[in-house]
Amino acid sequence: GDTPEPGSDTVRALAHALNYPTEFFYLSDSEALGTEAVSFRSLSSLTARQRDAALAAGDLAFELHGWVAERFELPAAQLLDLRDEDPIAAAEALRSHWGMGAKPIEHMIKLLESKGVRVFSLAEQHKHVDAFSCWRGNTPYIFLNTFKSAERSRFDAAHELAHLVLHIHGMTNGGRDIEREADMFASAFLINRGDLIGHLGRVNSLARLVSAKKRWGVSVS
C-alpha cells in the first residue's frame, strides 16, 4: 500500500534535527533526476546504489532550491552556450563575458553563484563521487565533493562549469573526449593565458612555483 505520511511531531523533529524549515517537508515531489542529464565523471566506477544515492541528493537540492527561490531573489544564470567552441576559446569567451579580465579567480564558488549557478556540497556518504553537474530547466547546478583539497575542489568546479557550457543538455557520462575537453576548459578558465605568460619567466625556483600556485589557486603538479 501507500507509504504513510509522517505525523506533524515527526516532521517538526526532522526539521529541528536537520535545521530545515518545516514547510520544506510538505513540498510536492519534483521530477526525478536521471543519469542521462548528469555529468557523472566517474559513473562507470559507481555502484548502482552509489549512483542512485547521488541522484537522490540532487533531487533534494532541487527541492531546497525551489523553496529558497520562491522566497528570495537569486541571480539569473549568465552562462553561454559554447557547444561549438574549442574548450580553450570557450573558457576565454566566458571569462570575457563575465568581465573577468586576466586576473586570477579569488573565490570560485562565489563567482559561480554570482553568475546564477546553484552550487551544492555533497555529504560525506557521497565522497566516492568526484562531482557532477546538470541543467534543470534554465537553472545550472554543480554538486561538489568537498572532501578534497581546496585546489582540487576549484578545479572540479571549473570542470563542471565546462560541462554546463560545452555539453549543454547532452551529457554522455564520462566519455574520454568529453572529460578531456572539460579539463582543458578548466585549466584555461582558472589560469588566463596572458596572465600565465606574464608570470612564467619569474617562476624559476620551487619557492616561486609555490607562489604561482597560490596566485592561481591550483595544484603545483
Where are the language model's segments positioned?
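Short juxta-domain linker segments that transition from a proline/glycine-rich
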Residues: G1-S221
